Amino acid sequence: MPGNKRPKLDAQTLKALNRARPSAPPSNPEFTTNIDPTQQGDAAPSPSLPPPKPPTQINARDLKGLKYFNLINPLLEHLHECSTQRDRAGNRILHYDQYAALVLLFYFNPIIKGLRGITQASQLERLQKEPGCSRASLGSLSEAARVFDAEPLREIIGELAHKALPSTVGKEAEALRGLTAVDGSLLPALPKMAWALWQDDEHRAAKMHVHFDVFKGAPMDVTVTHGSGSENQQLRNMLLPKRLYVIDRGYAEYQLFQDIIDAGSSFIGRIKDNAAFEVLEERPITPEAKAAGVIRDAIMKRLGTEHHRNVLKQSVRIVIVATSKTDSNGQPDVLILATDRLDLAAELVALAYKYRWSVELFFRWLKCILGCRHLLATNQNGVEIQVYLGIIASLLISLWTGKKPTQRTLEMLQFYFSGWATWEELQAHIEKLKDHK
């Protein structure tokens, strides 16, 4: 793999390495390892099913805190008649807004562990009365995952993300306004999910592609494809103006860089260690940049060799950052970052790439803590609905608390929805979060 080769550094960079060693290497995991824990390419998602467990009996005592769903219902009510064109007889029992509320309940109530739990909970009078959910059989839940269009949920994500306020302010946040970390992450899929091709005919996985607003601490947009879906193409499809996209070297495509610029945005992206470039101007390294690990800052005449078509229409800058990881000779490994932002201080370019790790932490939250990797549907549309509702659940927590979602906050919400915590205790937890700076 190209990412495992030693970088071929030119004489200028080697000279800079020998002259300057970072006094305080960044502590972010991105600067100490090149392995993405959410996407280890050599490890296939396990296709085997866990041994069956006896179903958990759910009763009304297990369904507390449903008043929160009275706050959610207005968000979902416009979905009620969505995707009902086939229902000419007008006898549909389970509507889209009700299905969405049931999936959200799956995320917030730990008693409900899967489709059978959702089915059993939907039979309870209290759930039918307060959130207004209808009784749902396994068949109706399976049908809902096929017939309800997932796209309206992306619109809700956009509305909630727009309401989220920045959790980080200051000069750095102002200079890096619109900083958006972009990456993809795999969700294990079952062998019968033929649409979810990944690597070869034997493996199955879905992939979610997330745009994460770093300073809001919130996802802005998401799409779902099969495991082999092109991350670069999904980024092209989701581009917005006035964003500063920070991307890893999997997105290192010069035409994509130009597409980002053409969309009215900017980029900071890691390029491959053996990338060729022609220097136009060397920039001095300030003490602040040196402290951030920057060993070289230069404006390029072109990226790539003379044999490649120069697709970038404007000057591009290269910032080389030494990491805390060293090779066998004791020399620091380096990150070669490309950006069209000639105005940013070099230390801010390094910091922006360091912030890319925030999207990886969000993947861990979504899959391992919230439980999004436990798929409720086997078709692509159903997986999209579940992922989008997981994003909505995350955004709701952020809006309720004013902070990015954490395991402790989710636990407190689950205590409340399980009847172990009172409304007052939940409110006290939220107020404590708001008071914590």
Where are the predicted features?
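Single, function-defining residue in the core of a domain
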Residues: 2-117, 146-148, 156-159, 174-178, ...
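DNA-recognition alpha helix
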Residues: 113-131
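Catalytic micro-motifs at enzyme active sites that drive phosphoryl/nucleotidyl and oxygen chemistry
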Residues: 129, 168-170, 197-199, 256
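Major-groove recognition helix of helix-turn-helix-like DNA-binding domains
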Residues: 131-148
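A short, well-structured juxtamembrane/interface segment
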Residues: 162-169, 231-232
